[in-house]
UniProtKB/Swiss-Prot annotation:
Localisation per UniProt entry: Cell inner membrane
Protein's membrane topology: Multi-pass membrane protein
Gene behind this protein: mraY
Record field: catalytic activity: UDP-N-acetyl-alpha-D-muramoyl-L-alanyl-gamma-D-glutamyl-meso-2,6-diaminopimeloyl-D-alanyl-D-alanine + di-trans,octa-cis-undecaprenyl phosphate = di-trans,octa-cis-undecaprenyl diphospho-N-acetyl-alpha-D-muramoyl-L-alanyl-D-glutamyl-meso-2,6-diaminopimeloyl-D-alanyl-D-alanine + UMP
Highest rank taxon of the organism: Bacteria
Pathway connected to this protein: Cell wall biogenesis; peptidoglycan biosynthesis
Biological process terms in GO annotation: cell division; cell wall organization; peptidoglycan biosynthetic process; regulation of cell shape
EC annotation from Swiss-Prot or TrEMBL: 2.7.8.13
Protein's UniProt name: Phospho-N-acetylmuramoyl-pentapeptide-transferase
PROSITE patterns: MRAY_1, MRAY_2
Function: Catalyzes the initial step of the lipid cycle reactions in the biosynthesis of the cell wall peptidoglycan: transfers peptidoglycan precursor phospho-MurNAc-pentapeptide from UDP-MurNAc-pentapeptide onto the lipid carrier undecaprenyl phosphate, yielding undecaprenyl-pyrophosphoryl-MurNAc-pentapeptide, known as lipid I.
Enzyme class label: transferase
């Protein structure tokens, strides 16, 4: 929004032309979202506490979690507000990638909001029924996939890129829609499953989001893309603003979500952030790299799938409890140790993902 104002003023005052620089707007996007989170966070936490919008804790969960009962939740709404405001202020709102990504993020956040509202405010322990949650995730995920496919102008926009191999690609055709659907919906649910400990989900989300910003910037720059043998995708650079806002909002939220948490993000945050990472990974054609960098999310999801499958087929459990972070808690690991070690794993995996830019 402010880009338009700056463009107009630049006709009369040349200093405003600096706002045409993507890097400056990205920095401002990070700082804007960070400040919104830090300034609004305490007010939101007080309001959530006043209206008793607190986390319900499972009776069959780790005993160490019983003390978390009543901790304010639905704090993910703060993240979404910070991202939306910062993006609307600093991004080019004529860019289709920005609009699609922001739209998907807010729509998945709406699903999470309804689920949280039913659980916390209406005191319905089931929240939004799983079939309806998955239905709306499918509607929005499939809708985004079709929209990206129909608006694709270049062959590389629907081509699967294989990491570490510059000459191995796969033209997906309509298969792009199916892959996009699974990446968006899968990413959404994976982050949601990971969000079980204080700060466990938000920091990997910030790290993966920051890495995807690097891919978005380089893919949108013709010379860098050619040099690194990655697809040149005009317009993806503008996603750096959105991802910068995500990073800033996430860091601001972590200020209050770090152990011991003052607030939880809830489904409104987790579902939205996972979908955001997924849709960006698709746009910059780095789905497989996203799978690597988001390895913690993948591990958490696979642990649940294996646990359920094993119990149904054999009557036995593979893990003491799923998702995986609960397994380590029940093995005696203190919560901060689980969190930090999962962060360390994410740092390593993100570096591996970034290494694919050069190792081809």
């Amino acid at each position: 929004m402010l880009v338009w104002v700056a463009d107009f003023l630049a006709q009369y005052f040349s200093i405003f032309s600096v706002f045409q620089y993507l890097t400056l707007r990205a920095i401002l996007g990070v700082l804007t979202a960070l400040l919104i989170s830090l300034l609004v966070g305490p007010v939101m936490i007080r309001k959530l506490s006043y209206y008793q919008i607190g986390q319900a804790v499972r009776d069959d969960g780790p005993e160490s979690h019983f003390s978390k009962a009543g901790t304010p939740t639905m704090g993910g709404a703060l993240i979404l507000v910070a991202i939306a405001v910062s993006t609307l202020l600093w991004a080019d709102l004529t860019n289709r990638y920005v609009l699609i990504t922001l739209g998907v993020t807010l729509l998945f956040g709406a699903i999470g909001w309804v689920d949280d509202w039913r659980k916390v405010v209406e005191r319905n322990p089931k929240g939004l029924p799983a079939r309806w949650k998955y239905f709306w995730q499918s509607v929005f995920g499939f809708g985004a996939a079709v929209l990206l496919f129909k608006t694709a102008h270049l062959p590389q926009e629907t081509t699967l890129i294989v990491p570490f191999f510059k000459d191995i690609t796969l033209a997906l055709g309509v298969g792009f829609v199916l892959l996009t659907y699974f990446v968006i919906v899968g990413g959404s649910n994976a982050v949601n499953l990971t969000d079980g400990l204080d700060g466990l989900a938000i920091m990997p989300t910030v790290m993966v989001g920051g890495a995807l910003a690097v891919f978005a910037y380089l893919s949108g720059h013709v010379k860098f893309a050619e040099y690194l043998h990655i697809p040149y995708l005009p317009g993806t650079g503008e996603l750096v603003i959105f991802l910068g806002a995500l990073v800033g909002a996430g860091l601001g939220f972590l200020w209050f979500n770090t152990y011991p948490a003052q607030v939880f993000m809830g489904d409104v945050g987790a579902l939205a952030l996972g979908a955001a990472l997924g849709v960006v990974a698709v746009i910059v054609r780095q789905e497989l790299v996203f799978f690597v960098m988001g390895g913690v999310f993948v591990m958490e999801t696979v642990s649940v799938i294996l646990q359920v499958a094993s119990y149904k087929l054999t009557g036995r459990r593979i893990f003491r409890m799923a998702p995986l972070h609960h397994h380590f808690e029940l093995k005696g690991w203190p919560e901060p140790r689980v969190i930090v070690r999962f962060w360390v794993i994410t740092v390593v995996l993100v570096l591996v993902g970034l290494a694919t830019l050069k190792i081809r």
